[in-house]
Regions:
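Active-site nucleophile-His-acid catalytic modules used for acyl/amide transfer and hydrolysis
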Residues: 134-196
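N-terminal accessory segments that precede or flank the first globular/catalytic domain
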Residues: 2-7, 11-126
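Short, surface-exposed acidic-centric catalytic microdomains
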Residues: 128-131
Length: 196
């Protein structure tokens, strides 16, 4: 019994003399928050609707507020614009259709998630003053602080692809611009119906 007692005391003194090593701070594998970077297009889309999900397709309307120039080669006369403004309450309208994406960049501590809304703006302009030909426009959507997206809804990849065809077909069938019956809003409603 004496030997076992001495052996226990010896082990206890060794344990006290050599404490358990504390983890090295540099080896600590704790959870860290990953940095997120939002593009201006994603920020504009999330501002219009907070429930957006990665890899999903969405559509929005984009209105040019009163006093903001349409640009993009539009040749509407001042009288036509004034009449349209009174009828619609805004300068111009288009439809933005696209997909929310998330990509990861960097390594280790520099790892970031980049969120984007890759989309196309579909709208119709008046190509010339006389006779007033319509023109289909489909540039990549770029966020603009003077224009706000308005929530439309969720759509599918197939319907998002059909938006371009619907816009082209509309302009092919409606060649001459008219404030009543063939304006930017009539065009926009046709594109919206294609993506609903």
């Amino acid at each position: 019994m004496r030997v076992s007692y001495l052996f226990s005391v010896l082990l206890a003194s060794l344990a006290v003399a050599s404490p358990v090593a504390s983890p090295n701070v540099s080896d600590d594998v704790s959870l860290t928050a990953r940095a997120t970077e939002d593009t201006p297009e994603y920020a504009a889309a999330i501002k219009a609707h907070s429930g957006l999900s990665k890899d999903k397709y969405y559509y929005f309307t984009l209105e040019w507020p009163l006093g903001v120039a349409v640009g993009d080669g539009d040749k509407e006369t001042d009288a036509e614009l004034k009449e349209l403004q009174q009828k619609l309450g805004f300068e111009h309208i288009g439809v933005v259709v696209g997909q929310v994406t998330e990509t990861e960049t960097g390594k280790g501590k520099n790892k970031k998630t980049k969120r984007d809304f890759i989309a196309t703006l579909y709208h119709m302009t008046k190509k010339n003053a006389n006779p007033g030909d319509t023109e289909f426009k489909s540039p990549n959507y770029r966020a603009n602080s003077k224009q706000n997206l308005k929530w439309g809804g969720e759509t599918s990849k197939k319907k998002a692809g059909a938006a371009k065809k619907a816009g082209k077909d509309y302009v092919d069938d409606h060649k001459i611009y008219k404030v009543d019956g063939n304006n930017c809003n009539d065009f926009a409603q046709t594109v919206i119906n294609a993506v609903k």
